[in-house]
């Protein structure tokens, strides 16, 4: 089975809720967001709009970040297709960051996650 997420961009109001819930779920440190929300102004006054585009890890079918990893620390779970990192194998070379087409890979040299003591959220 392969997981996916559908986002109705017409309903996105740029509240950053997806970004914050992802941050809480994964316990990332300050300044690290696995999800980002891009915004861009379009049109001219008085009909200006500002559409929002959530950018998440798309867990690619053939992830370039996994192929780029020299130690095999980046891998794909066979049961659900999600991309993950084995922190024990990671040497911190950051080639996965360079290879990610969505710029959604981050390096965290601090093992203690910002929300690490809370565990995963129930949803």
Task: Place the predicted regions along the sequence by residue.
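Non-ligating segments of multi-cofactor redox enzymes
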Residues: 1-123
């Amino acid at each position: 089975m392969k997981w996916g997420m559908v986002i109705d961009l017409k309903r996105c109001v740029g509240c950053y809720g997806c970004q914050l819930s992802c941050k809480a779920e994964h316990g990332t440190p300050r300044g690290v967001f696995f999800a980002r929300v891009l915004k861009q102004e379009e049109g001219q006054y008085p009909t200006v709009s500002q559409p929002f585009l959530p950018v998440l890890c798309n867990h690619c079918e053939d992830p370039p970040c996994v192929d780029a990893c020299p130690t095999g620390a980046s891998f794909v779970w066979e049961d659900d297709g999600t991309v993950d990192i084995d922190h024990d194998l990671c040497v911190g070379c950051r080639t996965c960051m360079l290879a990610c087409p969505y710029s959604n890979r981050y390096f965290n040299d601090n093992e203690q996650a910002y929300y690490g003591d809370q565990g995963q959220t129930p949803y």
